[in-house]
C-alpha cells in the first residue's frame, strides 16, 4: 500500500498581516483579490519582505488599487530594474466584485482595508476587508473585552490544577 504525499507545505502561507486594521475598523466582509506584481516583488515576497500595516485600498476609474504597501527589494535583485518599494499596485478582481465594492463604498460609507497578504498555491493574494471606522470608545470596549477573556482563561486554567 502506497502512502499519498501531502500537498500542503510545512509552515504558514501568510506573508504579512495587518493587525492594526482589526483594531481600527469593524470588518463587515472579507474579499480575496489577486495582485499585479513585478518579478522582483514576487522574489521578495517569497523571502517575506512585505509590510501592509499602513496600506489601504482605493477605487479609481472602476479599478481597485492598494497603496502604502511596502515590498523591500532583495540585495541581489537585478540591476537593470528600478525597484520602487511603495508603488501603487493594481488588484485583480472580477467586474461584479468591483461594482459591488464601489456601491458599498458610495452608498454605505464603508472603506476598504488590506487585512493580509498570503500565498494561494503559487499566486499572491490579498484579503480586503469592507470596513467601518471605530470610535475611540469602541476601541476601549474591545480592549476591555480582550483583557476580560484573558483573565477568565487564566482563572479557569488555575482552577483546573
Swiss-Prot record:
<dbReference type="Pfam" id="PF01668">
    <property type="entry name" value="SmpB"/>
</dbReference>
<keyword id="KW-0694">RNA-binding</keyword>
<comment type="function">
    <text>Required for rescue of stalled ribosomes mediated by trans-translation. Binds to transfer-messenger RNA (tmRNA), required for stable association of tmRNA with ribosomes. tmRNA and SmpB together mimic tRNA shape, replacing the anticodon stem-loop with SmpB. tmRNA is encoded by the ssrA gene; the 2 termini fold to resemble tRNA(Ala) and it encodes a 'tag peptide', a short internal open reading frame. During trans-translation Ala-aminoacylated tmRNA acts like a tRNA, entering the A-site of stalled ribosomes, displacing the stalled mRNA.</text>
</comment>
<dbReference type="GO" id="GO:0005829">
    <property type="term" value="C:cytosol"/>
</dbReference>
<dbReference type="GO" id="GO:0070929">
    <property type="term" value="P:trans-translation"/>
</dbReference>
<dbReference type="GO" id="GO:0003723">
    <property type="term" value="F:RNA binding"/>
</dbReference>
<dbReference type="InterPro" id="IPR000037">
    <property type="entry name" value="SsrA-bd_prot"/>
</dbReference>
<dbReference type="InterPro" id="IPR023620">
    <property type="entry name" value="SmpB"/>
</dbReference>
<keyword id="KW-0963">Cytoplasm</keyword>
<comment type="similarity">
    <text>Belongs to the SmpB family.</text>
</comment>
<protein>
    <recommendedName>
        <fullName>SsrA-binding protein</fullName>
    </recommendedName>
</protein>
<dbReference type="InterPro" id="IPR020081">
    <property type="entry name" value="SsrA-bd_prot_CS"/>
</dbReference>
